[in-house]
Amino acid sequence: MTTQAPPTSLLPLSPEQLARLQAAVGEFSPTQMAWLSGYFWGMVNQQPGAVASPAVAAPPPVTVTLISASQTGNARRLAEQLRDDLLAAQLSVNLVNAGDYKFKQIAQERLLVVVASTQGEGEPAEEAVALHKFLFSKKAPKLSETAFAVFGLGDTSYEHFCQAGKDFDSKLAELGAQRLLDRVDADVEYQVQAQQWRQQVVATLQAKVPAQSTAPTQFIAPTQSTTPAAAAITSGGTTTVSPYSKTAPLTAQLSVQQKVTGRNSEKDVRHIEIDLGDSGLRYQPGDALGVWFDNDPALVEELLALLWLKGDEPVSIDGQNMPLAQALLSHLELTQNTTLIVDKYAALSRDETLIALLADKPALQLYAKNTPFVDMVRQAPSDLNADQLVGLLRPLTPRLYSIASSQAETENEVHITVGVVRYDIDGRARSGGASGYLADRLEVDGDIRVFIEHNDNFRLPANPETPVIMIGPGTGIAPFRAFMQQREVDGASGKNWLFFGNPHFTEDFLYQVEWQRYVKEGVLTRIDLAWSRDQAHKIYVQDKLREQGAELWNWIQQGAHIYVCGDANRMAKDVEQVLLDVVALHGAMDAEQADEYLSELRQARRYQRDVY
């Protein structure tokens, strides 16, 4: 929630004094600000006739700076929990979103705690990219006066597990900082590890820093990331707390499920509309919809048959007893495999092929990525019992989809654009867990459990006159549909430019009629389209960006905000390289200057990405 300053007429300061004060405090770190607050309090409350002296002022409280580097909200929620723990222990804490952290002040930090998630192939969370770049640059200062701890969040199904956390931990140590605790690398099911780590952090800091005798000062960066992200949304200057979250989702109803790619398309993309009813669930353009799903019953039956299990065997999931079949249907992950699961299953099955695979890490990673658990069991039969099976599998996790609508237009509905995952293994048709559920198994008017994952790192500019550049091939177009709905309702006068790409114009132009209407009515100023397979030479959105480099630079010079949504591993990296090339060429900069310029755009929230 943003707190507005009172009118200057109500302040005990003249406009000139207020201006000087604001200019002065901008130079101080949170620790220095805390000391000054105590110093000024002492000046006001001193005995008559006494002379204020900095030498006798109370020692400044040592502030713990807690940086949240979150991609899907988990790191942010963990950081908020740790903040509350530290406040309860009467320690001064400053919780800040990595994207808002003024990293040039890092040399002044004495106690630093980082909660960092990893995205894609070992990349830091989008909001932490600038901080990551700074620490790995020549400008990073020595941190010999800093003590730190790092908690890494990741997913063992990816090769570079918790790489961002590892990067922050190793670089901080390399710069001279001292570890308070060993780094923790946590998998998808991180809650138990996180709770233990929080207790260790509090105990360690309590031993290192005396508790404050009065309520600790807490400096919070002006960002919604410090509120419970899954349950709060700011609108019109007020914050509305929602009862719905990842752990307490809303049961909504599917109202529309429509294929939006052509009959001959190689892609199966669905437009999904979900009725929120009178739930009061609110979201903003840029947010994501979390979707809980059930596995395919046919997949459950196939797995049970392969293991000679009936499905009625009693098992326990998070302390709740249920039949094995129910656990497999609604509580355990069946469509994603990991190297750790392959390792454990190889030991249980004693399959020679799997055991040999363990010695070849690249081959193991590829196998786990491309072979669902049920197909591994089929290829390497075993006689697991129900408890062994449950012990192998990971808990089911919801999938996040970029929201493709604005409530300013759709009111009590939320729309998403879903690329259905379909593939064959040994002649057997397979589909993605959530995408197959939405496309094939969930019926219209059927119940669906959803929640909003707020993303304050992907927001339209506050000024409606600001130009907007949107780069979203494939299903990456989803949030830009929401952006355009919002800009149209707001009557925003700023220019809008869309870059979109897909294989074929006739089969894969998602929401074609809507974009044509926006162009005709002047809401969409420009649209550049890249059809990769409509000609012999493949053309992608990054090629269109390079082609329009001069005009792109002109828009950037006019203050345009740049947004990128879609594939993190290839498209987003290629687009960023083209942006760097455009900045260097048309801005007359060398590669290092262009990289710094793009980092400055990112810091100013003029370059935002929602990549996955």
Swiss-Prot record:
Role this protein plays: Component of the sulfite reductase complex that catalyzes the 6-electron reduction of sulfite to sulfide. This is one of several activities required for the biosynthesis of L-cysteine from sulfate. The flavoprotein component catalyzes the electron flow from NADPH -> FAD -> FMN to the hemoprotein component.
Signal peptide: none
Residues given in the record as FAD binding sites: 335, 369, 399-402, 417-419, 423, 432-435, 612
Name recorded for this polypeptide: Sulfite reductase [NADPH] flavoprotein alpha-component
Cofactor(s) the protein needs: FAD; FMN
InterPro entries per the UniProt record, alphabetical: CysJ, CysJ-like_FAD-binding, CysJ_Proteobact, FAD-bd_FR_type, Flavdoxin-like, Flavodoxin/NO_synth, Flavoprot_Pyr_Nucl_cyt_Rdtase, Flavoprotein-like_sf
Root EC class: oxidoreductase
Binding note for cofactor: Binds 1 FAD per subunit.
Lineage summary: Bacteria, Pseudomonadati, Pseudomonadota, Gammaproteobacteria, Enterobacterales
Gene: cysJ
GO CC entries: cytosol
Pfam families: FAD_binding_1 (PF00667), Flavodoxin_1 (PF00258), NAD_binding_1 (PF00175)
Ligand binding (NADP(+)): S532, R533, K538, I539, Y540, V541, Q542, D574
Flavodoxin-like domain boundaries: 64-202
Alphabetically ordered keywords of this record: Amino-acid biosynthesis, Cysteine biosynthesis, Electron transport, FAD, Flavoprotein, FMN, NADP, Oxidoreductase, Transport
Keyword Metal-binding in record: no
Pathway connected to this protein: Sulfur metabolism; hydrogen sulfide biosynthesis; hydrogen sulfide from sulfite (NADPH route): step 1/1
Family: Belongs to the NADPH-dependent sulphite reductase flavoprotein subunit CysJ family. In the N-terminal section; belongs to the flavodoxin family.
Domain FAD-binding FR-type intervals: 247-461
Swiss-Prot/TrEMBL catalytic activity: hydrogen sulfide + 3 NADP(+) + 3 H2O = sulfite + 3 NADPH + 4 H(+)
Record GO terms (molecular function): flavin adenine dinucleotide binding; FMN binding; sulfite reductase (NADPH) activity
